Design a protein with these regions (language model features):
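C-terminal regulatory domains involved in ligand/effector binding and gene-expression control
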Residues: 1-134
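Generic recognition of cysteine residues
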Residues: 47, 54, 92, 97, ...
Length: 246
């Protein structure tokens, strides 16, 4: 099973049991309805399958995933859940950058660094609170530093018991929000539809890792879960920047 962090607004969307030692989730799921794809119009179990579907039907990865998801639940529900993922990610980054908590819990007396880093990068101007993207020239001062900040803010929220999106795990939870915030704040044509495309595309990559290998740090180490998150984020960013499935 898993342990939930104690937030009153948390929504439990599923429970899985830890596979026996020496096996993976892929071993356990070989006969599951999720994997056989019987209930979706475009089933895929490998990257080759996914690319072939995109080429055959002239669809993007996000289109494929959207069609599959809306075959199992309404389009309104799917969109609502994706919007909520983005909403929680934004609130997490904002809270991580603005919190008054100075030391993380746990007894190690580890200081929170994101608030001071944010104040320094933003020249004490509350850039994240502004709806208009690229609203301040300070955003252009250091793209990489801002991405680092976004990831750090989420990681510190996780360590502090805040509300996060497991993307795909708690340990790697900062990577996808960081890259998605980069898109939102640094790309001129960024919009809500792009966010949805990003999340759908990233989800397809995460599914392939989950099905064929593992996203668990306990199974494949921290770099396994971080590598998965990086691949998901890279795919999402590629999709919204005009890249193709290939």
């Amino acid at each position: 099973g898993f342990v939930r962090q104690g937030n009153a607004e948390d929504l439990m969307i599923g429970i899985h049991e830890r596979p026996p030692i020496g096996t993976s989730f892929a071993d356990q799921q070989s006969d599951s309805s999720l994997d056989d794809g019987s209930d979706v119009p475009y089933p895929f179990t490998s990257c080759d399958d996914l690319i072939a579907l995109c080429e055959k039907h002239h669809m993007s990865i996000a289109d494929i995933v959207w069609a599959n998801e809306t075959a199992m639940q309404s389009a309104v529900q799917v969109r609502s859940e994706l919007d909520n993922v983005w909403r929680v990610m934004r609130r997490c980054v904002q809270h991580g950058c603005h919190t008054s908590q100075t030391v993380l819990p746990g007894g190690l007396n580890a200081p929170r660094r994101a608030p001071k880093m944010y104040a320094r990068l933003a020249s004490n101007s509350d850039v994240l609170a502004r709806d208009k993207k690229r609203a301040d020239a300070v955003l252009e001062s250091s793209d990489a530093a801002w991405v680092d900040l976004f990831a750090l803010a989420v990681s510190e929220e996780n360590a502090g018991g805040g509300r996060i999106v497991t993307a795909p795990t708690n340990g790697a939870a900062g990577i996808i929000p960081a890259v998605l915030h980069y898109y939102w704040h640094f790309v001129d044509h960024a919009n809500e539809e792009g966010v949805i495309t990003f999340l759908l595309t990233a989800g397809a990559v995460g599914y392939l890792f989950k099905r064929n290998a593992s996203i668990s740090g306990a199974e494949v180490g921290c770099q396994g879960e971080v590598g998965t998150a990086c691949s998901m984020a890279a795919a999402g960013l590629c999709a919204v920047m005009g890249g193709t499935p290939q």
